[in-house]
Structures are given as C-alpha cells and as structure tokens.
Amino acid sequence: ETDGIAGYQLFEAGSGIPIGPVESLSDEWVDLILHTLKESERLGLEFAMHNCPGWSSSGGPWITPDKAMQIITWSETKITVGKQVRIQLPTPKHMFDYYIDTYCLAIPANMKVIPRLSILELSNRLDKDGVLTWDVPTGEWLIMRFGQTAKDQKNKSAPSKSTGLDCDKFSTEALDYHLNCMFKRLMPAMEKIAKHSKIGLLIDSYETGDQDWTSDMPAYFEQSHGYELYPFLPVLANKIVESEESTKRFLFDFRRVRADMFAERYYGHFQKRCKEKGIITYTEPYGGNMMEELQVAQQLDINMGEF
C-alpha cells in the first residue's frame, strides 16, 4: 500500500512451477483463499481472482460433456435406389461417449453446387438408434447425419487436480453451473466483503479455442437472420449451397451468430452474475477467432492488456 499497490489478481496456475503442499480446490485451499480475502479487506487492498483454475477460460473437473463446449459433427452415406429403404447410418465421430442427433439431410450426390430447394430434411425419419426409413426418390443421394458432441478442450494452465473440460460459451446455464461449482464455498465471503471493499473476478485472455454449436443454435440463428439454418448445414461440411455468393453470405451470418452468442452469453452473462453480487469484472478481451474484440470488451467493467 505504501508503494502504491492498490490490489492484486490471484491465479491458481499450474504450468512451469512445482506442485505446492496444498492441494488445489481442497478444503485447505479454500480456507487459505478465505484468509487472503480477509487480509485484503484488513489492508484495504482489492482482491481479484480468475474465474477458474489456470488462466483460461472457464472450466474444471465438474464440467460434464453436456455442459462443455459443443461442436457439430456429421457422417455421410451414399444411396442409389428408387424405393423405400431402412438403413443404419454411421454415428458421426464424437467424444466422451456423448452424442446428440440434430439433423438428418438428403442432398443430391455429386453436385458441386447444391440447390437449396433440393435439400430434404429427414430428421423425423431417423430413429433414436440412427436407423433411417425413407422412400428414396430416383437418383443418387448423399445422406448427411448431423449431431453435436463435446469438444476436448480443458481450462488452460491449471494444476492437474483442477483441470477439466471448459464450459459451453454459448450457454448461460453451463456458465452458471461452472460459477456455482467454482465459487460455492467462496462466494458468501466475497459477496459480503464486496459491500464495502473491492472484489473482482476475471476472464483472462481467451485461449480455449472455437466452438460452433449449442442446443438452441438453430433457433437463435433464425431469430437473428430470418431464415432457417438447416439447409446450409452442408456448408459447414465444405459444400456449396445455392451459389458461392449465398454460401459466403451464410458463413458471414453464422460467424456473426457465434460472435454474438459468445459476447452475450459468456462475457455478458458473466458480467450480470458478478454485478448481482457487487463484484467488479475484468477481462483481456482478445485471443479467439470467434470473438469480435470490441463487442466483448464493452460487456465487462475493466479491460486489460498484457506486455
């Protein structure tokens, strides 16, 4: 305080340093953090800490695959018959024995540019075991079975005991779950001290990669842009739908939705949760391809850089 230090930020880091005598996230660790909070209050110092172990981004051993970052996955099957078929479609590649079907589409096979109106939506003909029953029109068709799975992305640079999957950045419910698990033993003291002293939480530079799906992505997309997402799903599998121009326009809209969901549901919701407790928010608003930095920066109280 005499030297002009007004506060500090605490990181539970685990990269490049020896493992200490106190186990990360243990009861002893919690007691030490609570002691640090009280000492900061006594000394008139601002206490801030990262929102999860490590320094990026929001995860831990409590995050299950259904609450982790979600990505789209698909399999392809060619068929050439003009009659009813009952066929087992291959399950798309997935992680952690976690997979949910989203759409089943049929598109004309061997076409460089796929007319939008030729894409058939067959999801209601696909059963829970991945068996498709369909009266196939004459011609050669490519069946695309789309689904979602969890991304194998963990919080960065955390001790091994407190490393786990990173939460879904497009889901406020997943972020709520993470924050509740991380701070359930600390938040009562933090909220109490925040009434008369400075307490902060931080999302450091974003280093846990992209995601491209969440359960309500189709509804959010249609509400934002006024057209359905599913006919353009083949674009995410490197195909051209309608025209090159239409495909590029869809990709712009899709990336816009990702950026909006990321800013609103991750950074914006983090700010909302912290504000409810009287806690100041910090961020380094950069590091990920799916973010618009200025859109992210305006969500939180204080922006930072590093050098």
Regions found by a protein language model. Give the residues of each.
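Hydrophobic targeting/anchoring helices
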Residues: 56-61, 277-307
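N-terminal-proximal low-complexity accessory segments that begin disordered
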Residues: 1-18, 22-23, 294-297, 303-305
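Carbohydrate-binding surfaces in secreted/extracellular proteins
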Residues: 47, 270, 281
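Generic beta-strand/beta-sheet core signal
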Residues: 10-13, 50, 203-204, 280-286, ...
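Mature extracytoplasmic enzyme cores
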Residues: 1-3, 7, 23-252, 260-262
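Active-site-adjacent structural elements in folded domains
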Residues: 253, 257, 261, 285-290
